[in-house]
């Protein structure tokens, strides 16, 4: 699989923080077994059904609703200028935890397909939530510092921990709106 590259990456993701922040909190630490370190307390995960997600391109934020009540917000990467996200309303079609990823590599006139294994460093992270619009969905990302910066192939990209939280609270009837 595409596992963590080192212990700091694993700890940062587990405690919902950027590696640089983990290092700043633990400047004189070596991150060896038995050593005490300081981490962020992410609190309890959301445990409420999400009936609607609204992706705001204006502020790079994903809003989660239960009925008319806003229950969570997430920083997100929503499309890019080269390949923008769609506009409109879609429905969750499928959900995959620890997905494989098909990559196509083109060299000259030769193109090869590769199937990349699951893991936190998979290009779609640890979650894929497919929409009823082909090739569009909600996904995790192995690059935590990229949220809020438009640089994706039209999908809605979140930190792996936020994508997992959404995965646990949506179903195939959940609406996803892009505005």
Model-derived segments and their meaning:
Residues 45, 59-62, 80-84, 96-100, ...:
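Solvent-exposed loop/turn segments at secondary-structure junctions
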Residues 110-179:
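Exported/periplasmic cell-wall-interacting domains
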Residues 21-53:
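Extracellular LysM carbohydrate-binding repeats and other cell-envelope/extracellular binding modules
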Residues 8-9, 19, 23, 59, ...:
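Extracytoplasmic/secreted envelope proteins and their assembly/folding machinery
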Residues 41-80:
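A structural motif detector for short, solvent-exposed N-terminal "entry" segments of globular domains
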Residues 1-16:
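Primarily a LysM-type cell-wall glycan-binding module
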Residues 16-17, 32-34, 48-50, 57-59, ...:
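Extracytoplasmic
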């Amino acid at each position: 699989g595409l596992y963590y590259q080192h212990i700091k990456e694993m700890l940062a993701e587990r405690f919902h923080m950027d590696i640089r922040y983990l290092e700043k909190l633990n400047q004189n630490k070596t991150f060896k077994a038995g050593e005490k370190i300081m981490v962020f307390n992410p609190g309890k995960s959301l445990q409420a059904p999400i009936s609607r997600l609204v992706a705001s391109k204006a502020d790079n934020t994903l809003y989660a609703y239960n009925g008319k009540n806003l229950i969570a917000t997430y920083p997100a990467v929503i499309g890019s200028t080269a390949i923008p996200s769609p506009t409109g309303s879609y429905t969750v079609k499928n959900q995959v935890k620890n997905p494989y990823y098909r990559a196509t590599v083109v060299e000259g006139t030769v193109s090869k397909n590769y199937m990349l294994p699951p893991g936190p460093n998979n290009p779609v992270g640890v979650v894929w939530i497919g929409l009823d619009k082909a090739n569009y969905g909600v996904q995790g990302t192995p690059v935590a510092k990229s949220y809020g910066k438009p640089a994706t192939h039209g999908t809605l990209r979140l930190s792996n921990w936020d994508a997992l939280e959404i995965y646990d609270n949506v179903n195939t009837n959940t609406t996803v709106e892009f505005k």
